[in-house]
Design a protein with these regions (language model features):
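Charged interaction scaffolds used for protein-protein
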Residues: 1-11, 34, 40-45, 52, ...
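Short capping micro-motif at the N-terminus of alpha-helices
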Residues: 14-16
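Short, surface-exposed, low-complexity cationic segments
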Residues: 18-38
Length: 143
């Protein structure tokens, strides 16, 4: 997944692929896929809690941020920028230096939320389950 993001009026190219996971691991000493799963689990639990408490219509982005905080989303945006830069021989500022210079922090973090959603949707199965497929021989038998 490759895209361009505008932060503080500056365009950044982002890239999410296998290399992203190794850069994330090297820079943050954490596993990206485990962190993504943890974010999803916390989000699901927060939705269930809101439903139990009579708040089923709360903004899902707010619920996601409230359940997980902003650090993961900061990291996700930065590591996707760093991945792109790595493939194109560019330098990326150190994570904390990069984040410290962001003027529009809310937009930066929300970009991470959108990227997470795209990553999750990009990894969903797009092929029909083989057990659900109907072969031409099966169709003939049904007639």
């Amino acid at each position: 997944m490759e895209q361009t993001l505008s932060i503080d009026g500056k365009k950044y190219n982002l890239l999410y692929k296998g290399k992203t996971a190794s850069i994330y691991r090297d820079c943050f000493n954490r596993d990206l896929l485990v962190d993504i799963q943890e974010v999803q689990i916390k989000f699901g639990e927060a939705i269930e809690k809101n439903v139990r408490e009579g708040n089923p219509d709360r903004d899902p982005y707010f619920v996601l941020l409230q359940a997980n905080g902003s650090l993961f989303f900061e990291r996700l945006v930065w590591v996707c920028i760093k991945t792109y830069d790595t493939y194109h021989g560019k330098e990326t500022k150190a994570f904390q230096d990069f984040v410290d210079e962001i003027e529009n922090y809310e937009t930066y973090v929300m970009s991470g939320v959108v990227i997470l959603e795209q990553v999750i949707n990009a990894n969903k199965a797009t092929v029909q389950n083989e057990s659900d497929e109907v072969t031409s021989d099966d169709k003939k038998k049904e007639v």
